[in-house]
């Protein structure tokens, strides 16, 4: 597999002449678009090998490499007249490489299995077009060094197990009173597991629930130097197919009745954490020295602590809990 994709940037390419007319009155941290951006380029390679183990079983190994160049990112224009300013340019690059091992068992004795494991390394100078924006606004040099990207999920495991009885002459289930009691039902179980996404650890404690963040966050270690915990999720589906026909001349209508459970084990997987503590429900501010002083200054410290803690419980920091669906699909 070989693929080359070239596309126009979707960020920062609009020209607004008024921004330049009043450049001197704008703050030096203001961002100006760049109408002279070049197309972003992605080159994707993949090579694989597939081997049949039996008539119904196969193993596939694939290695992939993706390179992105001329990616748009924020940069600071130094020594410009009349003031220095922040703009965007085609400076970022990234590489994503890894391998995938897949196992496929076609339906054998009512059982079908598909599973895959992916090992991936994603590095580059920026995860998106604004990842360098704060650095450019701070007046620091335009540093470029490969780091872990924010979507660098090192390990990913997927598995799909399906067990179902077929209909007609292929039925091999129990029969009671000439009745095929388990004709066309099925049970499907899906597993999704993977290592956590990287994030930037923080060395000091500040408030993430107040309207103003004080003091400023201080980076701890390297960019994206910490990772979220592993995620595990099971989804289960129980369904059965039916065929309905009004009369011999009418068209058959397929009906599928299903009972579906997402996040079967009600796992509390983390989507995001507070950088200072690495926890999804505590930013560490209330227990810090500066936080305790701030709490003591409130009219009702106990009420403040209670409401502050409630605000820290951001539901977006967790994946959705267990959900149950009962439905009908009609195919005609």
Q: Model segments located where?
A:
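Outer-membrane beta-barrel translocator domains and adjoining extracellular loop/strand segments
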Residues: 10-17, 24-25, 72-78, 120, ...
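C-terminal beta-signal and adjacent terminal beta-strands/loops
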Residues: 6, 168-215, 229-233, 239-332
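Membrane-embedded beta-barrel scaffold of Gram-negative outer-membrane proteins
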Residues: 3-12, 20-24, 29, 35-86, ...
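Extracytoplasmic loops and strand-loop junctions of Gram-negative outer membrane beta-barrel proteins
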Residues: 26-33, 81-88, 96-97, 139-145, ...
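Membrane-embedded beta-strands of outer-membrane beta-barrel proteins
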Residues: 35, 47, 89, 99-101, ...
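Transmembrane beta-barrel strands of outer-membrane/channel proteins
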Residues: 1-4, 13, 59-65, 115-119, ...
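Residues that define the transmembrane beta-barrel architecture of outer-membrane proteins
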Residues: 41-43, 93-97, 153-157, 230-234, ...
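Gram-negative outer-membrane beta-barrel transporters
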Residues: 63-68, 79, 84-196
């Amino acid at each position: 597999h070989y693929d080359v994709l070239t596309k126009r940037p979707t960020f920062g390419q609009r020209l607004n002449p008024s921004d330049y007319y009043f450049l001197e009155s704008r703050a030096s941290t203001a961002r100006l678009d760049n109408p002279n951006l070049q197309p972003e380029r992605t080159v994707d390679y993949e090579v694989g090998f597939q081997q049949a183990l039996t008539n119904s079983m196969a193993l596939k190994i694939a290695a992939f490499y993706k390179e992105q160049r001329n990616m748009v990112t924020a940069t600071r224009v130094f020594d410009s007249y009349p003031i220095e300013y922040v703009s965007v340019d085609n400076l970022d690059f990234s590489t994503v490489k890894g391998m995938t091992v897949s196992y496929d068992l076609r339906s054998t004795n009512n059982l079908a299995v598909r599973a895959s494991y992916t090992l991936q390394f994603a590095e580059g100078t920026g995860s998106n077009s604004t990842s360098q924006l704060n650095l450019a606004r701070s007046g620091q040099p335009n540093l470029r060094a490969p780091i872990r990207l924010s979507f660098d999920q090192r390990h990913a495991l997927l598995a799909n197990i399906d067990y179902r009885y077929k209909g007609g002459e292929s039925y091999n289930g129990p029969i009671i009173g000439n009745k095929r009691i388990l004709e066309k039902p099925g049970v499907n179980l899906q597993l999704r597991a993977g290592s956590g996404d990287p994030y930037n650890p923080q060395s000091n404690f500040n408030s993430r629930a107040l309207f103003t963040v004080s003091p400023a966050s201080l980076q701890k270690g390297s960019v994206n130097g910490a990772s979220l915990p592993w995620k595990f999720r099971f989804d289960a589906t129980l369904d059965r197919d039916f065929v309905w026909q009004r009369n011999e001349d009418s068209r058959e209508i397929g009906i599928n009745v299903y009972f579906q459970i997402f996040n079967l084990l009600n796992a509390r997987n983390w989507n995001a954490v507070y950088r200072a503590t690495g926890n999804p429900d505590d930013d560490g501010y209330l227990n810090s020295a500066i936080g305790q002083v701030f709490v003591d200054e409130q009219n009702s410290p106990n009420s403040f602590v209670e409401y502050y803690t409630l605000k820290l419980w951001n539901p977006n920091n967790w994946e959705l809990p267990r959900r149950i669906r009962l439905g009908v699909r009609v195919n005609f």
